[in-house]
């Protein structure tokens, strides 16, 4: 896996502009921040973000992959201002779950998600080198 950074561009903080990888592909559905019983333990965006990331990792583990294999994330939030106000809290959450992997990412604000209580939903693409 190789992070792509065009010459002269500043290094982005918390993500990569692009990733080049080859191998076995794994795609997740949109994953929300509920537990294995489909219960939201947190009604805060940061708590749901942490659980959604843990859920993504649990899915990847089913095919012998982990956070280091994630090459792309699309993060959907219902309130981008809330997300931005929690950046200081989200950074340590990210590090504790994802380590120092910073995939290509998009952050998209949506009116609402299918699960009414969900504040965040994450789709992931992972590549496991073979």
What are the roles of these predicted feature ranges?
Residues 1-71, 77-130:
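N-terminal presequence-like segments and the immediate start of the first folded domain
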């Amino acid at each position: 896996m190789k992070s792509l950074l065009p010459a002269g561009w500043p290094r982005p903080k918390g993500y990569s502009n692009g990733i080049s990888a080859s191998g076995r592909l794994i795609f997740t559905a949109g994953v929300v921040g509920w537990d294995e019983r489909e219960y939201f333990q947190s009604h805060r965006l940061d708590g749901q973000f942490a659980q959604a990331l843990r859920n993504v990792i649990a899915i990847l583990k089913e095919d012998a992959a982990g956070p280091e294999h994630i090459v792309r994330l699309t993060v959907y939030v219902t309130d981008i201002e809330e997300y931005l106000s929690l950046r200081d809290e989200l950074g340590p959450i990210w590090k504790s779950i994802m380590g120092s992997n910073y995939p290509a990412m998009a952050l998209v604000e949506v009116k609402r998600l299918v699960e009414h209580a969900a504040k965040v939903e994450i789709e992931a693409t992972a590549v496991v080198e073979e």
